[in-house]
């Protein structure tokens, strides 16, 4: 006689203890929370790239070699639904074509959509030219090399993704930021022959002659930072992405023989100093400093007399970096971390007009350039000749250009990126308008479209408004960009 069949429910009940024991023996699955990875990649030109043209001056200069190293630093972060990245490059300016190619390669390597990748120049003035600027021109072999290194850095950071916790805080350092545009009472001629400019960049120290009256804009002393640590036991610190609205410092290190060196300016030194403060002995910790809305900001106070002493090469960079790192480290101690946060990002191209020269301005430029000129090492030396050359080049620009805007949300933190040297008051306006608790802007990201003054600053004139490859967008560009960012932030706020 055969035994009666066991009911299915009873069979399941008998197997349940075995199933439970099997599941307990399996490794715990990774939670669907936040993940992050980091990378630091050397972007110093290879021996075959030298001599290189360096950026940051109206005249081209050639560097035969260097003992200093320059880098790009990457942070990839997000959740299972959305990954995004921030890469800061020791470079003055990087054109969109180069960055689009780097992003395309990085997207192929990682699967992260190119529109989720943010790549920005720090704006050091001591790096190889990556974009044409005044009389400096990049070499194609270094541009190709740089695009590959940026893509590889993003891929390397992506390969190191691990569960993490993220938080943010805001410090302050008001000691290193001064508006470099000043109202002046004495008229001066600009390179286009006009005497109408009311504002002058870097006017010199006020020695009581009354020429310098008041700054033409505010400053932003904030030092916001995004902090990342491992979710594993021990909470190993992984990275910091900080932001400061200060153009650059300059006067890079030199060899004992006096030869100029490449340099990542105070941004590179911040990375080293902050890492020593926050994660001593940990070579895998990556500190990144991005440039905020600093198009009209430097660290020179023209309201009083000149300093009693000058700084040795590299000394001022170190002092500024240490000051900013101290402020960032104070904020770092107040970070509250979270293992799960909403992550979202949006991007758009905004078509903006180009300030093309009139025929009269073109004729004047041609007249200047066909008259006898002084040259130094193949460079025009007179400002009017330099800007005449720029006038003829801008004449060939299209009537409109696409300007890339990107915005990312990580919880109640919003990061905006713009391809312009953005005036500080624009950054402050966006912070005030943001629906998020903390917002900061990274400039010179995802391309290069010159200075971004407000319409009022355009009316006042001064270097940052003079038409050139460094300043060519329509006078209402800032108004349109702010409006676009408002819409993008509203879209991010509504994202699930």
Residue ranges and their predicted role:
Residues 1-12:
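N-terminal secretory signal peptides that target proteins for export/translocation
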Residues 12-25:
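Bacterial N-terminal signal peptides
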Residues 25-32:
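Boundary at the C-terminal end of the N-terminal hydrophobic targeting segment
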Residues 32-120, 124-285, 290-319, 332, ...:
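Conserved beta-alpha junction segments in alpha/beta enzyme cores
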Residues 324:
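Anionic-ligand-binding alpha/beta catalytic cores of soluble enzymes and soluble regulatory domains
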């Amino acid at each position: 006689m055969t035994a009666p069949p066991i009911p299915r429910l009873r069979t399941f009940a008998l197997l349940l203890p075995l199933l439970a024991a099997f599941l307990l023996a399996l490794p715990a699955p990774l939670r669907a929370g936040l993940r992050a990875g980091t990378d630091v990649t050397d972007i110093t030109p290879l021996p075959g790239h030298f001599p290189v043209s360096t950026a940051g001056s109206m005249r081209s200069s050639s560097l035969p070699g260097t003992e200093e190293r320059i880098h790009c630093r990457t942070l990839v972060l997000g959740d299972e639904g959305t990954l995004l990245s921030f890469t800061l490059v020791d470079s003055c300016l990087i054109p969109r074509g180069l960055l689009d190619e780097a992003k395309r390669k990085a997207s192929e390597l990682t699967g992260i959509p190119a529109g989720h990748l943010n790549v920005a120049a720090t704006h050091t003035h001591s790096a190889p030219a990556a974009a044409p600027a005044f009389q400096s021109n990049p070499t194609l072999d270094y541009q190709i090399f740089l695009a590959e290194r940026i893509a590889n850095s993003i891929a390397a950071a992506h390969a190191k993704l691990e569960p993490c916790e993220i938080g943010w805080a805001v410090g302050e350092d008001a000691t290193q930021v001064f508006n470099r545009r000043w109202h002046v009472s004495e008229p001066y001629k600009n390179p286009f022959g006009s005497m109408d400019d009311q504002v002058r960049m870097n006017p010199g120290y006020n020695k009581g002659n009354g020429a310098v009256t008041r700054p033409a804009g505010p400053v932003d002393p904030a030092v916001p930072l995004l902090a990342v640590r491992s979710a594993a036991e021990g909470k190993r610190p992984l990275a910091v992405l900080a932001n400061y609205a200060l153009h650059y410092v300059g006067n890079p290190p030199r060899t004992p023989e006096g030869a100029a060196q490449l340099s990542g300016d105070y941004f590179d030194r911040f990375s080293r100093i902050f890492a020593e403060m926050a994660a001593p002995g940990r070579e895998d910790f990556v500190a990144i400093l991005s440039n905020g809305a600093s198009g009209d900001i430097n660290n020179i106070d023209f309201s009083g007399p000149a300093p009693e002493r000058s700084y040795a090469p590299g000394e001022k960079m170190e002092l500024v970096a240490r000051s900013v790192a101290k402020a960032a480290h104070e904020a770092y101690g107040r970070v509250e971390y979270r293992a799960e946060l909403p992550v979202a990002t949006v991007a758009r191209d905004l078509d903006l007009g180009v300030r093309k020269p009139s025929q009269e301005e073109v004729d004047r430029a041609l007249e200047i350039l066909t008259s006898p000129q002084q040259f130094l090492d193949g460079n025009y030396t007179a400002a009017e000749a330099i800007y005449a050359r720029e006038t003829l080049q801008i004449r060939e620009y299209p009537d409109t250009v696409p300007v890339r805007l990107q915005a990312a949300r990580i919880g109640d933190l919003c990061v905006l990126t713009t391809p312009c040297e953005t005036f500080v008051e624009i950054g402050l306006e966006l912070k005030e308008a943001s629906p998020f608790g903390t917002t900061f802007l990274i400039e010179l990201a995802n391309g290069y479209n010159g200075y971004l003054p407000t319409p009022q600053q355009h009316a006042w004139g001064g270097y940052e408004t003079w038409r050139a490859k460094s300043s060519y967008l329509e006078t209402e560009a800032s108004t349109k960009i702010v409006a676009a960012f408002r819409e993008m932030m509203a879209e991010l706020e509504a994202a699930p």
